[in-house]
């Protein structure tokens, strides 16, 4: 099972971080960006889209941490997005559509 959560804390902020950990982490990033996984540990700017409509959700920074050399020991990704509630909820909704997340 792949898990995801807001790791930057609740409330209004300029930037929010969604952390994803587990075997489907790479699938999540590929599905949201329609691009390959970025170079490990290198911040990469990407457009983050609705999986079904390709509508832009936000433009954010993706960080990829392959396991076992990650914070959790599993494949892991961080998505740094704008901190508004609508953006956060939209991204969490899209991730939840992916099998095993």
How should these model regions be labeled?
Residues 1-101:
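A glycine-rich (often HGG/GG-containing) alpha/beta subdomain
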